[in-house]
Amino acid sequence: MNKNEKMVRSLMGTVVSNKMNDTVVVRVERRVKHPKYGKFIKRSTKIHAHDKGNECQIGDIVTIRECRPISKTKSWTLVKINERAEKVE
């Protein structure tokens, strides 16, 4: 890695909303250990990500990476769609 390159955070999650123009809401799940009981618990956070071209559908599994702030709530951008959601007819 050169001096000019920065480590960029990237996460994988599921698209839960695509109703906004050029924006998707991605739910990212993580597992944390309960401090007292030691059981692993699922915790999730919802992140707004920039989706140029409105490619994502609800249920898609996507990779997002951190970028400069695009708006008040958006500072992540879509890298790729790992898995498409199945169409239900």
From Swiss-Prot:
Gene3D superfamilies: Nucleic acid-binding proteins (2.40.50.140). Pfam families: Ribosomal_S17 (PF00366). Keywords: Ribonucleoprotein, Ribosomal protein, RNA-binding, rRNA-binding. GO terms for cellular component: cytosolic small ribosomal subunit. InterPro entries: NA-bd_OB-fold, Ribosomal_uS17, Ribosomal_uS17_bact/chlr, Ribosomal_uS17_CS. Coiled coil: none annotated. The keyword Acetylation does not apply. It comes from the Bacteria. One of its GO terms (molecular function) is rRNA binding. GO terms for biological process: translation. Part of the 30S ribosomal subunit. One of the primary rRNA binding proteins, it binds specifically to the 5'-end of 16S ribosomal RNA. Belongs to the universal ribosomal protein uS17 family. PANTHER family: 40S RIBOSOMAL PROTEIN S11 FAMILY MEMBER (PTHR10744), SMALL RIBOSOMAL SUBUNIT PROTEIN US17M (PTHR10744:SF1). This is Small ribosomal subunit protein uS17. It comes from Coxiella burnetii (strain RSA 331 / Henzerling II). The gene is rpsQ.
